[in-house]
Amino acid sequence: MKKFLLLALAAFALAACNDDDTPDEFVQGDNTIAVFENDRLVFYDYDVFWEYSEPYTDPYGVTCIDLYMNKTRFVQNMPALDMEVPGIPIHPTPAGFEFDLRQAVPYYRGEPMPRYTLYDLEGELNGTLLELEFSCIGYDVEYLG
């Protein structure tokens, strides 16, 4: 029994000395955002909720949605903001829709936020599951919700 306790204590001491600064294991689930830099997870948040408007037809006959990004942070030190990306052209699919934009400027309180321009914005609604990915201020962002 003493050997077991000593081994357990040694294992605990080694684990406590871990100086790895990478985030804990991240499991992507509903209403989560994951942020990567050079394919390395640098930030994640389980407290986001993104939603979208009902599809509508813009003046040019294009079917669009507005994306609402509630409590959004693209990097850890960014304040959580409620932002909107209006007028995203969508392509209907049997299970929902998909979209692919080269870039989009989000809005905060009705004002454009060009500093947070979203690049290579891709997304898909499959049933009730919304998946998005894009790049912003040098980070790759993935949302699942």
Where are these regions (language model features)?
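N-terminal glycine/threonine-rich, aromatic-flanked beta-hairpin/loop signature
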Residues: 44-84
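Extracytoplasmic electrostatic interaction patches
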Residues: 101-145
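Hydrophobic lipid-interacting interfaces of membrane-associated proteins
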Residues: 35, 40-41, 70-76, 104-107, ...
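Extended lipid/amphipathic-ligand handling interfaces
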Residues: 47-59, 85-92, 118-127, 145
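Bacterial Sec-dependent N-terminal signal peptides
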Residues: 4-6, 14-36, 131-145
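Contiguous, well-ordered beta-strand patches that form the walls/edges
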Residues: 72-118
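Short, hydrophobic/aromatic-rich segments at coil-to-beta transitions
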Residues: 23-34, 61-68, 93-104, 130-131
